[in-house]
From Swiss-Prot:
Renumbered residue ranges of the record's region Disordered: 23-42
Lineage start: Bacteria, Bacillati, Bacillota, Bacillota incertae sedis, Caldicellulosiruptorales
Pfam family name, one: SepF
Subunit structure: Homodimer. Interacts with FtsZ.
Function summary: Cell division protein that is part of the divisome complex and is recruited early to the Z-ring. Probably stimulates Z-ring formation, perhaps through the cross-linking of FtsZ protofilaments. Its function overlaps with FtsA.
Gene Ontology CC: one annotated term: cytoplasm
Swiss-Prot/TrEMBL keywords: Cell cycle, Cell division, Cytoplasm, Septation
Transmembrane intervals: none
Protein name per the record: Cell division protein SepF
Keyword Cell division found: yes
Location in or out of the cell: Cytoplasm
Family: Belongs to the SepF family.
Keyword Electron transport set for record: no
Organism, scientific name: Caldicellulosiruptor bescii (strain ATCC BAA-1888 / DSM 6725 / KCTC 15123 / Z-1320) (Anaerocellum thermophilum)
């Protein structure tokens, strides 16, 4: 590309020009015995039940709310109890968890005044109000108040 005089001048000032290599034609031969690189495995899971974990937290400090959100992010059902949390921190914890619930498209259910259940979006939690009322009247599951 460059003539000899230009090349010498550029070499003198410290710039080296490399010749572009002409592309060589490479002949491709297909190996008859080679397996395709992107072979997808054919796996069928039979009889594997959904294994959903339930995590229970008895929170005492606001700093512990991160554990609830981390468990929810891992698609675990989380039950958390706020009975031992100072009154001024309860609303902050509920707000924090509510933000995580919104971001992760999860659901939060109030079990009692200070006990909540948070479920990931892949899980439906249905509460039968009639059954809940029956339990309350009989004193079964006192936390359902």
């Amino acid at each position: 590309m460059f003539d000899n005089l230009q090349r010498k001048f550029l070499n003198l000032i410290g710039i080296e020009i490399e010749e572009e290599d002409k592309p060589q034609e490479v002949s491709k031969t297909k190996d008859e015995n080679a397996k395709p690189k992107h072979e997808t495995p054919k796996v069928v899971t039979i009889g594997k039940a959904n294994q959903t974990e339930v995590t229970v937290y008895n929170l005492k400090l606001f700093d512990e709310v991160v554990k609830v959100c981390d468990a929810l992010r891992e698609n675990k059902i989380v039950v958390f109890n706020l009975e031992q949390v100072a009154e001024e921190h309860i609303q902050r914890i509920i707000d924090f968890v509510s933000g995580a619930v919104y971001v992760l498209d999860a659901k939060i259910h109030k079990v009692s005044k200070k006990i909540f259940v948070v479920v990931p979006r892949s899980i439906d939690l249905e509460v039968d109000e009639q059954l809940k009322e029956e339990f309350r009247s009989k004193g079964v599951f006192a936390w359902l108040k």
